[in-house]
Amino acid sequence: MDLRFVQQLECVPDTEGGEAAFVVLEQIVEKGAKRRFGCIGKIEKNRLAHEFELIRATDTAKLFLYWADIVAAIRQKIYPYIYSVQNCSLVCYCLGITEVNPLLAGSYFERLLTRRSTHVPILFIEVPKGRGREASESLGGEVKSLIEIEENAALPDLDPIDVMDFFKRATFENRELLQSAAASLGLAGQKPLETVRALADLLVYKRYKEFMDEKPSLLYQEDAVDLLVKAGLSYEEAECARRAFAMKNRAEIDCCRNAFERAARKNGYSIGEANAIFSAVEKEINFTVCRASYVAMAQYLYMNTFLQDKTKG
């Protein structure tokens, strides 16, 4: 494991040591999964098992427990909006850290954590204007570098109970609400929206309109990684390639290209086909964004529209 990663992880409060922390995490996640899903299906079980494997391999159980404690503490007074890569984790969803189900968002856990991670993921939290100091009181000084809290004047200062009640029953399937949410940002088009993921797409196009003239074929990081995985890489290998592309680390990119060519050839791709796929992903990676983060934005927008309509009613 990378020494930088280990040193950063040492800053996290260790309420349960080593294996004990992992056991506690499993127990809390199991309760959370039952609360989220009722009956835990095979897909959910397999995803949780995969995430637990990587959490154990990176010895980060206490990190997930700490995130859950911090979010719960802030939520006692303020609703914390989470837009960061924790939205890619089913463990985080079951812990109540995020309200995004990564299975529905089509996101992969390795976007958050891999065996080759060099830095502990930062938890980014946004709170309404004027509530930052109050939210920061929940953090210990030694771990402030691992959690960032920012104020956002555009966020409504809602009662956390109202927000949690909404997410307990939300299906995000009301087409009128989806259209109203899009219209509130000037995004409503001729084609009716049917899903919160479609609303997320509109949010991406609005924020990155200047890039869209390039007509990128890839919109999300998840799409880029899926292309590499389908050709033969594991999700960990594909995520390492994505990060190398984003950092423009030529030595690492060349290493990933060699690994990709070997894997693709085993799956029946020619060298030319493999190079074309790899080069296309490298070219377009900077156009892509994390789908799970934009699904979170879309869900919050839908929620705000619902609560505003409820108040008017």
Show where each model-derived region lies:
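Alpha-helical scaffold/interaction cores of sigma-54-like transcription cofactors
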Residues: M1-G313
